[in-house]
């Protein structure tokens, strides 16, 4: 009821303004920013501003109004900072002052022309000479700009969250800095940035369920990409030796604190290296990013001190299972009957055509992942679950593959690429023959096999989940907090 009443009065003010003024003007220009004002003049004393007339023109959203008779203090803010505005009858006419103060509400966007000064409490402020109402806010803002209390509203109305929540603003500014520094690092290391299709004729590069769309003119179904992997490797066949892509992937699967159907990844591929070299690149990349943002290699996340100093810990998937599963041995997890019983004891639903490798992965996900707090490369992934990775020379059941875990989250997946077209073809066909209920979207990619037949040089490639990395570097615990517009259930259901 209170909100309805306030909306009524705000609309009434707007209608009065329509009669006499050019409302929603677009001819106001800033000559600086609030951030630059603070940076350049914060340390100057009151006398400096008495002797130097600093004329500024700035704009922002009103977040507080204090009316004190013949003068008033406003506070305006933009995405970066805030500043106090002083307006009085002495600086503009009495009639204009009364009219302006009567018009204004918290949430309005105003332009201010004035001079800088410092108050008796040494607060850097703007003495207003002219004030322009640029946008009238008809709806009142929640909770006096102290932040939204309802997390669901934060996700559905991100604009309100950004206006009222400093942590959210900082999170998304930091996200931009992280991505910019990833790009700087890759370019510094002589990688070429490329773009590959977002719509695929068949889903490839992963086992996830795809989103399906339809091209009307061609009358064909297309799939939003699960991963760009197969296209990127075709570019290595074409002669590129160091490439990367930062873009969206789509997986038609469940929502969780670390899963969103639409997410951002950086994938990169390098010719003439193997997965050991690849791990060094990943270490250097993360070390570079953390140092650029925090000027140190250690950060706090969820009360853990995370150390990004090189080298990161390495452990095989098999050793990690034995370490975190009591009384489980290497021989146990190599025997199909015993490992099946172990999986069932952990309440894992086992499908009949799962082999030892798939069961190891399921047990690892259930019992080990959450314990990997410090940056850890888990290596020696089973061939059964790694159809695109090169098998080890001395053991064809495991591959030259790693996944990087930080704070219990997988943030990277890389391996030495399988470049034998015959072996790759056999792997694809074996996948098709043994696909489980959760793997019904596996297809045989003939074009990729054809490209391998022209010759893929020895190559290693890696994908890094940007959203999960941002979660860790901004101390957020849900992927929804680091994606501006996360996927949500229908609010009406």
Swiss-Prot record:
| Note on how the cofactor is bound | Binds 3 Mg(2+) ions per subunit.
- What is the E.C. number? 6.1.1.6
For this protein, the record's PROSITE patterns field holds:
AA_TRNA_LIGASE_II
Entry's transmembrane regions: none
Q: Which cofactor does it need?
A: Mg(2+)
> Primary place of residence?
cytoplasm
Reaction equations catalysed? tRNA(Lys) + L-lysine + ATP = L-lysyl-tRNA(Lys) + AMP + diphosphate
Which cysteines pair up through disulfides? They are none
Q: Which GO terms describe its molecular function?
A: ATP binding; lysine-tRNA ligase activity; magnesium ion binding; tRNA binding
Record-given protein name: Lysine--tRNA ligase
Q: Report whether Flavoprotein shows up as a keyword of the record.
A: no
What family does the database annotate?
Belongs to the class-II aminoacyl-tRNA synthetase family.
The entry describes its oligomerization and partners as:
Homodimer.
Q: Where does Mg(2+) 1 bind?
A: 403, 410
Tell me which UniProt keywords the record has, alphabetically. Answer: Aminoacyl-tRNA synthetase, ATP-binding, Cytoplasm, Ligase, Magnesium, Metal-binding, Nucleotide-binding, Protein biosynthesis
Where does this one sit in the cell? Cytoplasm
Please, which domain of life does this record's source organism belong to? Bacteria
Q: Name one GO cellular component term.
A: cytosol
Catalytic class of the enzyme: ligase
Q: Which residues bind Mg(2+) 2?
A: 410
Q: Name one GO biological process term.
A: lysyl-tRNA aminoacylation
- Kindly give the NCBIfam families that the UniProt entry links to this protein: lysS_bact, PRK00484.1
Alphabetical list of CDD domains matching this protein: LysRS_core (cd00775), LysRS_N (cd04322)
């Amino acid at each position: 009821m209170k909100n309805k009443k306030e909306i009524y009065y705000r609309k009434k003010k707007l209608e009065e303004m329509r009669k006499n003024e050019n409302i929603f003007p677009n001819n106001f220009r800033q000559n600086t920013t609030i951030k630059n004002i603070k940076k350049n003049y914060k340390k100057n004393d009151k006398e400096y501003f008495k002797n130097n007339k600093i004329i500024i023109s700035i704009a922002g959203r009103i977040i507080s109004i204090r009316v004190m008779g013949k003068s008033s203090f406003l506070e305006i803010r933009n995405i970066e900072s805030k500043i106090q505005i002083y307006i009085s009858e002495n600086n503009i006419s009495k009639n204009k002052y009364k009219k302006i103060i009567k018009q204004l509400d918290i949430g309005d966007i105003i332009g201010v022309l004035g001079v800088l000064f410092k108050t008796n409490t040494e607060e850097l402020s703007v003495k207003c000479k002219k004030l322009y109402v640029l946008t009238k806010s008809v709806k009142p803002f929640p909770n006096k700009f102290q932040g939204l209390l309802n997390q669901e509203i934060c996700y559905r109305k991100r604009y309100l969250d950004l206006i009222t929540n400093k942590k959210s603003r900082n999170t998304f500014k930091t996200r931009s800095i992280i991505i910019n520094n990833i790009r700087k690092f890759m370019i510094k290391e002589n990688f070429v940035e490329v773009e590959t299709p977002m719509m695929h004729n068949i889903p490839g590069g992963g086992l996830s369920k795809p989103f399906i769309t339809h091209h009307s003119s061609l009358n064909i179904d297309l799939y939003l990409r699960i991963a760009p992997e197969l296209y990127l490797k075709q570019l290595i066949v074409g002669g590129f030796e160091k490439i990367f892509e930062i873009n969206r992937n789509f997986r038609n699967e469940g929502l969780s604190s670390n899963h969103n159907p639409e997410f951002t990844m950086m994938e990169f591929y390098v010719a003439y290296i193997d997965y050991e070299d690849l791990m060094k690149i990943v270490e250097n990349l993360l070390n570079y990013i953390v140092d650029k943002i925090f000027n140190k290699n250690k950060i706090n996340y969820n009360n853990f001190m995370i150390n990004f100093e090189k080298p990161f810990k390495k452990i095989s998937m098999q050793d990690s299972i034995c370490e975190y599963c009591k009384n489980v041995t290497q021989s146990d997890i190599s025997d199909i009957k015993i490992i099946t019983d172990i999986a069932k004891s952990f309440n894992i639903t086992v499908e009949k055509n799962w082999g030892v490798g798939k069961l190891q992965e399921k047990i690892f996900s259930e019992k080990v992942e959450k314990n990997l707090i410090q940056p850890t490369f888990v290596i020696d992934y089973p061939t059964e679950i790694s159809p695109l990775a090169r098998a080890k020379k001395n053991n064809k059941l495991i591959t030259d593959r790693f996944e990087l875990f930080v704070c219990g989250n997988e943030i990277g997946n890389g391996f030495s690429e399988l470049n034998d077209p015959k072996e790759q073809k056999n792997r694809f066909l074996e996948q098709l023959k043994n696909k489980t209920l959760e793997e019904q979207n596996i297809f045989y990619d003939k074009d990729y096999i054809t490209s391998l037949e022209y010759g893929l040089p020895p190559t290693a490639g890696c994908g890094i989940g940007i959203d999960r990395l941002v979660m860790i570097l901004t101390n957020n615990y849900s992927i929804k907090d680091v994606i501006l517009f996360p996927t949500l259930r229908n609010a009406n259901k």
